[in-house]
Amino acid sequence: MPTYNQLVRFGRKSKTRKSKSPALESNPFKSGVCLVVKTVTPKKPNSALRKIATVRLSNKRTVNAYIPGEKHSVKEHDRVLVRGGQVPDLPGVKYHIVLGAYDISGVKGRKQGRSRYGAPCKQIAVTKK
């Protein structure tokens, strides 16, 4: 507990919050180039082959980013858009690739949750009477 005089002289220091996605440098998105596309297995209770890509961002940092959805078109040297967001069962994967941006197509045949997977809207023909 500080004394009154210590508070007058030094004040209270506010804690600085640590960023969960430091490579984005306070930006919502960063563009980058895909270096490697690979599959990894998740932590203990889960079992799958999760698709991730190693991406070199525009600020020269290299990160591992998760590729969401069922099928993907991510290849080496593709230009991708990266957003923050951890994958709970993949250690070291703190970023997601945005589908439907730059060289990456969205998930085809998606009817619900389309914006998350970059799926286009099926236009409904309206006839005038």
Curated annotation (Swiss-Prot):
Residues recorded with modification 3-methylthioaspartic acid: 89
Entry-linked InterPro entries: NA-bd_OB-fold, Ribosomal_uS12, Ribosomal_uS12_bac
Entry GO CC: small ribosomal subunit
A single MF term (Gene Ontology): tRNA binding
SUPFAM superfamilies, alphabetized: Nucleic acid-binding proteins
An individual GO BP term: translation
Pfam families, per the entry: Ribosom_S12_S23
Keywords: Methylation, Ribonucleoprotein, Ribosomal protein, RNA-binding, rRNA-binding, tRNA-binding
Annotated signal peptide: none
Summary of subunit composition and partner proteins: Part of the 30S ribosomal subunit. Contacts proteins S8 and S17. May interact with IF1 in the 30S initiation complex.
Job of this protein: With S4 and S5 plays an important role in translational accuracy.
NCBIfam families referenced in this protein's UniProt entry, alphabetically: rpsL_bact (TIGR00981)
Family classification: Belongs to the universal ribosomal protein uS12 family.
Descriptive protein name: Small ribosomal subunit protein uS12
Top-level taxonomy: Bacteria, Pseudomonadati, Pseudomonadota, Alphaproteobacteria, Rickettsiales
